[in-house]
Amino acid sequence: FDHPPLTTWVQSIILYFSDNKYFQIKVLPSISLGFVLIIMIIWQQYISKRLDYNQSLKSVILFLAVPIYAIFFCISFPDFLLITLLFASSFCLFLYFDRGNNRIKRLYYWYFAVFLFSLALLTKYNAILFGAGVLAYILYKKKDIGGPSYGHIIASTIMIFIIQTPVLFWNVNNDFVSFSFHLNERLDQSNGVLLILKNAFGFLLGVLFAFSPIFILNLRSNNFFKNY
């Protein structure tokens, strides 16, 4: 109950094709990784206006070198589907802003990005951080980058809530157990403040390790390691 159900729903479909538990566990992360790499290559091709095999290979290697992606696409966590959907949503957002004055195509990519984000939110609750960040940026930079009208933003919000109906309905009928777990039980001080701090510290160390290549490359770009 601590995660929305989309990953479980998709995995249940695999049951119709194979009863091999190892296949069931590995097939979805593998397919998701394939989708991400394909989108990455298409994105690279779109920016370069041609298929650059060298740049595409570098992009794939850099992606796989980031521990958090290697971990989540090797183990059957809900995160592999979350990453795939948000990656696809990001690409659609890129296409939305790149379409210039072609209003019809722009709206097509905007709503497709919203739809993919809604599915990501149906995979893990922390997808809301992506959506909140995108919305905050669009509202803050609206005069400079344009973006959807307030009417389309409201329509998109309604669309997101409609897609989350299964989660909302289940929580209403189960005393909001998912939200209670994330907002109360995980931070329950009866477990001890030291335990909460210990878990938070361990989480931060895990984040530093998981994103270590990004931090190192950023430091190098700022000439922190210019003498090494």
Q: What is each PLM-predicted segment?
A:
Residues 56-67, 91, 117, 121, ...:
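Short helix- or helix-capping micro-motifs
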Residues 119, 130-227:
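Transmembrane-lumen/periplasm boundary regions of multi-pass, lipid-linked membrane glycan transferases
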